[in-house]
Every structure is written in structure tokens, then in C-alpha cells.
Amino acid sequence: MEAMLPLFEPKGRVLLVDGHHLAYRTFFALKGLTTSRGEPVQAVYGFAKSLLKALKEDGYKAVFVVFDAKAPSFRHEAYEAYKAGRAPTPEDFPRQLALIKELVDLLGFTRLEVPGYEADDVLATLAKNPEKEGYEVRILTADRDLDQLVSDRVAVLHPEGHLITPEWLWQKYGLKPEQWVDFRALVGDPSDNLPGVKGIGEKTALKLLKEWGSLENLLKNLDRVKPENVREKIKAHLEDLRLSLELSRVRTDLPLEVDLAQGREPDREGLRAFLERLEFGSLLHEFGLLEAPAPLEEAPWPPPEGAFVGFVLSRPEPMWAELKALAACRDGRVHRAADPLAGLKDLKEVRGLLAKDLAVLASREGLDLVPGDDPMLLAYLLDPSNTTPEGVARRYGGEWTEDAAHRALLSERLHRNLLKRLQGEEKLLWLYHEVEKPLSRVLAHMEATGVRLDVAYLQALSLELAEEIRRLEEEVFRLAGHPFNLNSRDQLERVLFDELRLPALGKTQKTGKRSTSAAVLEALREAHPIVEKILQHRELTKLKNTYVDPLPSLVHPNTGRLHTRFNQTATATGRLSSSDPNLQNIPVRTPLGQRIRRAFVAEAGWALVALDYSQIELRVLAHLSGDENLIRVFQEGKDIHTQTASWMFGVPPEAVDPLMRRAAKTVNFGVLYGMSAHRLSQELAIPYEEAVAFIERYFQSFPKVRAWIEKTLEEGRKRGYVETLFGRRRYVPDLNARVKSVREAAERMAFNMPVQGTAADLMKLAMVKLFPRLREMGARMLLQVHDELLLEAPQAGAEEVAALAKEAMEKAYPLAVPLEVEVGMGEDWLSAKG
């Protein structure tokens, strides 16, 4: 058993913790941290981490944690407006505060709440008693009110780590501790609604105290205070000043019995259960509650069947990596392979964290290894924020090390623990066994297969783009009147807003400078010809630097093909993503994006087959909402955008013009992503009131869509998560946020996820069902991008493969509306799209 972190040490030092303040601070600092059940725990985690940091840096004879009592304090009675300006307590803060108090009790620390007094007064009184007995005192808080207590033996320990001492106050402000209350009284404190002296800021207050020494002396000599306007401000707010002084001064005379020996031994088992319940796996280690890594029980290679595998690669990309180490674990016994590559031949299946990666590497070496159970997939289904093995290990009680044997052991333990957590979750288990686990086999094969690139074409395109970029630069310089660095945002800012005097439409958050973002430039497109040229320059430069130039260097020398990585546990909706390179971001509709697709070509004697789900998200919406009008449009094979326009504008379908159809299309897809009337008015360049009317007419045309959205949000608020048709979850705790902008962003996320996630599940199901049949026909699955699947088949059988794939995708799962797939074939990806 690992030695527990020493919580008490007889070093003559006492730690006082401002519990309420620390909890509130971490509540907002770590917003969004939840358990896999969607339970918000950010304040609890942040509080525990802050405590650990303090405890590790120093040993303490006693630890006291002080919270504000529920009853009003004497300050509320003296000043009715005290703290009246504070925002209401967030809804899930009280529940987390209760958990923090439970944690304090389990740690054996003394917990105090004194009715009628704030935590500041309790802390101040506690600080004075040990100080008198010769102990050093540390007060863990970020509350600046308590800086008045610092002395030779009392220091404030800021959660970020620095100590506030008399020397620190003097160096930072030129103030002595006894002047701190006077300083606070002069400047006031908006967070506590303390008025201070209106018009006097920190700079003036420091100057006054430097000259007069104290507030008392300043007030005695008020008629001599200069300048006159400062003197008059103080005279006009004397009552506020005296009140602020009274309220800022903490009490040190509370009738408290302080026993430095009253702390208890921590409840080790209770603490372990608490941390496991909240999924604070990393804290188990930090508190010293994990089983000590006992010497591994080792056995000779090869391992028995069903063992979990651990491995270490020289780099993340398996097609390019060296296999540095290989081990396996079964029932706690580990087996190390002396020669990792040779050891692969003894495996029939890869079970373990990142199983797909090892299967890809094995395929590169000519071995057909099937990826099997992967705890990463289980963790991802529990909570899609579980995206890395390091994070999963920390969360569920383990450590991701660079040792292959420990990785194998970790995989076995995590698999067992995660399956326990999924007991009773039939939908999630179905997704694991029927979708995610078999899909990892498909993706491993796709990664190992890769896709051929026309390198000569890309090199020629690069030269062409370089010339076009140079021409655009000359145009920009001509319009600006002089050359400048187009890649320098500061120089561009000066040209646009100082020299050409274009309107500045926004500022950057970090620096406050005038923004030159794409959104700002789009809004300025019509304001000056230079903007259009800059946007074109940016697009060409980005695609040249991101795709056209790097792609040839990513072609593997042994295969002559490009091998992208498909990430199965990276998105919150269940969609796949790709990396090294990221093919999802190649523009589909722009001419240049299409020219990049032209570089993806078929092997000689083969053809590419491109299959694209048509309007799959709108079809999923029809099924989920059960809206009869929406369902009927798809069942009858009508154009959804034309029909929507017909209902929205009150005209027959044959009278719908292109502008009407475009408006309806924007609304159809905008509804899926929670587009506001303001955004719609910008997209369509129409008045705001007209955009509001468009959205309202849409919901009148499809009334059950609105009802489904409202039902989805209501269930999400109650359960803390939303789910797809197949039960895939996304936790959305901010559905209950009090801040309107935060809540509305969560709402858009919440009703989009079931649609987008169901579409992703349908694509995955289709891939799993189609894969073995393609292999039988000698065809290959190459890429999955957005709603599209790219295959490669011998030319002689390409049409048969296309027909088979189209049928498999359209019949992936029965819905209330038919799924429709558009098919094309060609020598390259662009021509296959038609």
C-alpha cells in the first residue's frame, strides 16, 4: 500500500483554509468538469488540488477549514447593501459545497462555521491564537481582505503559490499590514458592494496613505489634504468611507475554543471511496491511496490467449513508428517480448488501450492482427470527453507510463473497471459490441491501406498557387499604396483601419487590438476591393501550406500511399475525425478544395467509388421528431428545400424561385445548429424581423420539430445528458446555467448532438456491415469524411461494388424515412464525386 500523504506534521505551523472562498473560486476556474454521469465536480476537484498543493509544500501541526454560515453576519445588519451586488449563487454550487465539506471531514481536518460571522472573522480569530502560542500560521485564500492579518508569524498563502507577507505588501504596494484596511476602505470593493470613496482609485489611495500614514491621521488633517478635488471627494463620502472601514476590518475576538490537537486521522477507506465515486483517479495517487506498484509477476513470452497487450511506439503514427516494447497481461501476470516485432507473430488479437494502433503497425509488417477490446472505447462511450489514455487512466484510477508491461496491466484493470461501470447500460454496451469495437477493425484496415496521391499533380499545383499568391500580393500592395507584410496582423491592421480608414468591427479578446479575423474581413468585403484580395490570398496560402505542399511528404516510402489516422474517440458527437493529415478540413465546395481532391487517385487498373449520404441530418431529424410533413417530403422523394420554401412563402412548389429555395435551405440547416434570427438575417441579407418570421413559419410548417427540440432540452436538463437514437450520450451540464449566453450555447449543442450523433452512428453501422463484403469482392475502404465514404475497387467490378455499397448504406438501419446515397466513380476523388 502506498504511503499516504502526511496531512499533519509537528512543524510548529498551522494551516487555515478559507473554504467558502476557495470553493467559489475553483467553481468558476474549472467550469465544465463533470463525472461520466454528468455530475458537475469542478469546485470539489479544484478545492482538493489547492489543498494538496499547500500540504505538499509545507507540513502542518493542524488544519482548520472555515466556511461562511448560512445566517446573515453582523455586517449585513450594519449595512443592508453588503454583498447585495453579487450574482445569485449558481444552482449546482451548494451541492458541490456539501461534497467539499464531506471531503474535509474525511481528511480529518477541523471544519468550522460560526453563525453571525463570516469566514474572514473566524479565520482572523483562529490566526491570532496559534500566533500567540508561537506557531507560524498560513491562511490559504485569494481573498485580499485577509492581507491585513499578515505579520512576522502570519502569512497569506495564495492558491497560485505565492506568500503574502509584510515584505511582499511593502514591495508591491508600499504599505504596512496595518495600512491595508485603510487602503481597502478608500478604494472600496465592488464584489462586496463596499462603497469606498467614489472617484478614488488605487493610485490615489496609495499616495494618500504614503503622505498621511493612516486613514485616522488623514481624516484629522482633512482640510490640509491636496489636491482640492480629492479632499472634496472624501468629504462628500465620509459616511461611506467610515462604513467601508468598519466592514473591511476583520474581527479577531470571536469566542472560539481552539485546540490544535483536535484534528483526526483521515478516513483512508472513506476517502478512497469518495474520490472513486467522483472519478478523481489522479487524486488517489496524489493522496497516496493507490496500491503501491508491487513488483510485477512476470512470466515468459508468449502470453495466453485473451491477454491484454501494452506497447510503446517511437512516435504516435503507427505506419511510421518503431515498436520499442511489447508486453501482455492476463490475470495480473505480465509477459514481456524480448523482440517486440517478432513477438507480434505470437498474437492473434490485440486487446488493450489503443489496440487499433498496434493492429495498423502489424499490418505494415505483413501481419493480420485484429483489434479487439479497447478500454478507450468503453471510456469514450461512458463520457465522450474521455479522449486520451492519459486522461482515462487518471480519471479511473491508474497511471499511463512509458513501460509496456504496466500499460498491459493498466489495460486489464481499466477494462474490468469500466465494464462494471457500464453494467445495466444496455444501449451503450450494444454500441460497444456492435459498432465501436468492430469499427476499430475497419479503421485499422483503412489506415494501413491508405490512398494513392498524384504527387506530380500536387507539385504543379503548388507552383501555380505560388504564382497566383504572388499576383494577389501585388494587387494588395497596389491597392494599399505600398508593400507590407501580409502575414503580419499588426501591419494589416494599420493598413486597413488607419490608412484606408475602414470601420473596425471588433477587437481581439487578448490584446484589445482591432480584429482582422476572417469574420471581420467577410463583413468588410464590399467596403473596399483590397478586402476581397486579402481573403483570396489567405485561402490560397492556407490550402497551399496545409495540403498542397505537405501532402507529398506524407506519402509512405514503402507503400507509395498516404495513410491518414482515423480518430475514434476524439469528438463529442461520435463522429470520426482524421489527423496526420486532417482530411476533414479540405473545402468541399470551393474550386480550390475540389482541385486538392483531384490529387487523390486510384491505383492503376482500379477506380474510386464515392458514396455520399444525401441530407442525412435532415432525414434523421424527420425520424427523431416524427413530424408528418417532414417525413412525407422524404417518403415521396420531393426536394426538401423546395417544399420548405413552398410552405414558408405560401406559394406552390413550382413557383419557388432560387432565392426562396436558398432561404429555405439556410433555415433547414440553420435549425439543426440553433441558428438565431440575427445570424439568419446576416446570412440572407434580410431585415431581422423578416428572419424572425422565416423561423416562425418554418416551425409552423414542421410543428413537431419544435416540440422535439423542447422535449430534448427538457430531458437534457433533468438527466444532464442528451443521446442519439442508439443511446450514445453527450453530457451538457450547462443546460441549467444561469448565464443566458452559456445556457443558450449548451441548448444549441444539446439538440444538435442527437441529430449529428445519430448520423454518425448510421455511417459507422454501414461501414461495419459493408467492410467484410468489400473484402470478399477484393475492394478496399479508403476514407470516411463527413457524410461520405470513399472506396477503391478493380475497374471490372467497380459498378457492382458501387451498387452493393449504396444498398448497405441506405439499409444501415430502418428509419421512418428512406436514407438516400449519391454514388459516383472515377479515376480520382473529384471525378468520382461527379
UniProtKB/Swiss-Prot annotation:
Coiled-coil parts of chain: none
GO terms, molecular function: 5'-3' exonuclease activity; DNA binding; DNA-directed DNA polymerase activity; nucleoside binding
Gene3D superfamilies named among the record's database cross-references: 3.30.70.370, 5' to 3' exonuclease, C-terminal subdomain, 5'-nuclease, Ribonuclease H-like superfamily/Ribonuclease H, Taq DNA Polymerase, Chain T, domain 4
Polymerase: region residues: 412-834
Activity under varying temperature: Thermostable.
Transmembrane segments: none
SMART domains assigned: 53EXOc, HhH2, POLAc
InterPro entries, sorted: 5-3_exonucl_a-hlix_arch_N, 5-3_exonuclease, 5-3_exonuclease_C_sf, DNA-dir_DNA_pol_A_CS, DNA-dir_DNA_pol_A_palm_dom, DNA/RNA_pol_sf, DNA_polI_H3TH, DNA_polymerase_1
Ranges for domain 5'-3' exonuclease: 176-262
UniProt entry tagged with the keyword Isomerase: no
Pfam families the UniProt entry points to: 5_3_exonuc, 5_3_exonuc_N, DNA_pol_A, Taq-exonuc
Catalytic activity: DNA(n) + a 2'-deoxyribonucleoside 5'-triphosphate = DNA(n+1) + diphosphate
One example of a Gene Ontology biological process annotation: double-strand break repair
PROSITE patterns for the chain: DNA_POLYMERASE_A
Superkingdom in the source lineage: Bacteria
Keyword annotations: DNA damage, DNA repair, DNA replication, DNA-binding, DNA-directed DNA polymerase, Exonuclease, Hydrolase, Nuclease, Nucleotidyltransferase, Transferase
Record keyword ATP-binding present: no
EC number annotated for this UniProt entry: 2.7.7.7
Function as written in the Swiss-Prot or TrEMBL entry: Has 5'-3' exonuclease activity and no 3'-5' exonuclease activity.
PANTHER family xrefs: DNA POLYMERASE I, DNA POLYMERASE NU
Family stated for the protein in its record: Belongs to the DNA polymerase type-A family.
Name of the protein this chain belongs to: DNA polymerase I, thermostable
Gene: polA
